[in-house]
Amino acid sequence: MQMRHVIAELHYIADGHLDHRIKFEVNTELQKVVSSINALVDSTVNSMEEERRIEQSKDELITNVSHDIRTPLTSIIGYLGLIEDHQYRSEAELLKYTHTAYLKAKQMKVLVEDLFEYTKVKSTTTKLNPVRFNMIAMLEQLAASFELEAHKKHMRILVSGEPNPLMMEADTEKLGRVFNNLIVNALKYGQGGRHIFLDAQRIGSEVVVKVSNDGAQIPNDALSQLFDRFYRVEESRSQETGGTGLGLAIAQSIIALHGGYIYAD
């Protein structure tokens, strides 16, 4: 009798009632089977929900990429069309059209490169190549590489930390991409700031690196979304500062690969 009830319950679940579970008590041996069935259904439902989430995420990714590629591509086609139809009044205007098309093409190239990097670091097969290095020395090298760009914006990049040397193991190429993205953001969006601070400290078994500036603060309602792919703080949407919206998502994925965490406050 108990087995018939279990079979009937299984048929009910198999008919699509995946929120149903076998709840009645049976003898000890059969109870193990019932528990296993319930666990299997739970696992199946969770897998299906995860698959739906992944598919939705892929659809959103395609939509966002299509939009971000279409915008500069439309401009390129428009300006090249004007050139093709000889709709320019002077050589200066011709150069202006070609230069604008060139800048839009570069914008598309950056998006494609960032998208490739994002999908690469999100892959479960991505491997790290860890080496032992001095974190403070790495930050000093990064600061030096951005010195000219910072000078143009009347900013200085200051490095601090202890102990020095602060030795650790990580994939320096990927980690360099993280700090590169953070410094670029600090330069782009730190309106009114004069300094970018790079600080590294060993706290217990962790190395904590803080990138900050003394410019305009990020709105509180944007903090929780900063690391979402394609998210841009609305106030920063402009031709001058608009990036791909993938930089911080890439940074988060790289840090996660290292078993670490990243946040903004």
Predicted segments with their positions:
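Short beta-strand/loop element within the Bergerat-fold HATPase_c
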Residues: 193-205
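Conserved catalytic submotifs in the C-terminal HATPase_c
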Residues: 129-132, 151, 156-166
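Short helix-loop "hinge" at the ATP-lid/N-box region of the Bergerat-fold HATPase_c
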Residues: 186-187
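Short conserved segment of the HATPase_c
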Residues: 218-232
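Conserved glycine-rich
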Residues: 259-260
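HAMP signal relay modules and closely related sensory coiled-coil linkers
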Residues: 2-12, 21-39
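A conserved beta-strand-to-alpha-helix junction within the catalytic ATP-binding
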Residues: 129-144
